[in-house]
Amino acid sequence: MKKLMVVLSLIAAAWAEEQNKLVHGGPCDKTSHPYQAALYTSGHLLCGGVLIHPLWVLTAAHCKKPNLQVFLGKHNLRQRESSQEQSSVVRAVIHPDYDAASHDQDIMLLRLARPAKLSELIQPLPLERDCSANTTSCHILGWGKTADGDFPDTIQCAYIHLVSREECEHAYPGQITQNMLCAGDEKYGKDSCQGDSGGPLVCGDHLRGLVSWGNIPCGSKEKPGVYTNVCRYTNWIQKTIQAK
């Protein structure tokens, strides 16, 4: 199988102007990702996102752009699919403590113009609320750049595992906060990359992380991807959604 590189991260202020991608993955099953969102700006894929409520999509704060369009129910970006829905964003809420330079608190909520019509191919993903959850087997997905430098038509998936905080801090000395976690694959270098930012890290059928930043080039066996640690934000997410 053709190996794909998943670069789900942008590094430093300049990174936030790029997009992320998947490395060493393969095509996802069409029914395996009903929560996945594709964020577009000016007709081009910008980032991934996650449907967590019929009216709300969660993504990375560095994906903030004007006039975002959100697509749900997508599998092949080059085709118009009967399952797809498109919505504009009426409200973007970046975490108040987001720091673009360090990528700390890299999380944002997007309120859709209208509720998503839930179906087999459009469903919200539950949040991981337990930061001590020990499910280490995870997967990442997105339409980001692959190992051969192309952007795939169909969404790609890769299985990875959580990396201990000690290993994470060793890979990125002085850069990892409690609001971040690392995941990767030391055997094949499976990773997120350009075009995958803001997309989900799914562990045990719950949203554990959001693609945030990492090593450039993507897919290093020694440098795992860095993700926003979603369990740290469940209260903020709930309060934001419930706010008038």
UniProtKB/Swiss-Prot annotation:
Residues 22-242 form the Peptidase S1 domain. Disulfide bonds join C28-C157, C47-C63, C131-C231, C138-C203, C168-C182, C193-C218. One of its GO terms (molecular function) is serine-type endopeptidase activity. Keywords: Autocatalytic cleavage, Cleavage on pair of basic residues, Cytoplasm, Disulfide bond, Endoplasmic reticulum, Glycoprotein, Hydrolase, Microsome, Mitochondrion, Nucleus, Protease, Secreted, Serine protease, Signal, Zymogen. SUPFAM superfamilies: Trypsin-like serine proteases. It is found in: Secreted; Nucleus, Nucleolus; Cytoplasm; Mitochondrion. Residues 17-21 form a propeptide. Residues 1-16 form the signal peptide. PROSITE patterns: TRYPSIN_DOM (PS50240), TRYPSIN_HIS (PS00134), TRYPSIN_SER (PS00135). Pfam families: Trypsin. GO terms for biological process: amyloid precursor protein metabolic process; central nervous system development; collagen catabolic process; hormone metabolic process; myelination; positive regulation of G protein-coupled receptor signaling pathway; protein autoprocessing; protein maturation. Induction: By spinal cord injury. This effect is particularly prominent in macrophages, microglia and reactive astrocytes. Inactivated by autolytic cleavage after Arg-80. The keyword Nucleotide-binding does not apply. Inhibited by a range of serine protease inhibitors including soybean trypsin inhibitor, benzamidine and serpins. Activated by a range of glycosaminoglycans including chondroitin sulfate, dermatan sulfate, heparan sulfate and heparin. Its EC number is 3.4.21.-. Glycans are attached at N134. GO terms for cellular component: cornified envelope; cytoplasm; endoplasmic reticulum; extracellular region; extracellular space; intercellular bridge; mitochondrion; nuclear membrane. The record marks R80, E81 as: Cleavage. The active site is at H62 (charge relay system), D106 (charge relay system), S197 (charge relay system). Belongs to the peptidase S1 family. Kallikrein subfamily. Serine protease which exhibits a preference for Arg over Lys in the substrate P1 position and for Ser or Pro in the P2 position. Shows activity against amyloid precursor protein, myelin basic protein, gelatin, casein and extracellular matrix proteins such as fibronectin, laminin, vitronectin and collagen. Degrades alpha-synuclein and prevents its polymerization, indicating that it may be involved in the pathogenesis of Parkinson disease and other synucleinopathies. May be involved in regulation of axon outgrowth following spinal cord injury. This is Kallikrein-6. It comes from Homo sapiens (Human).
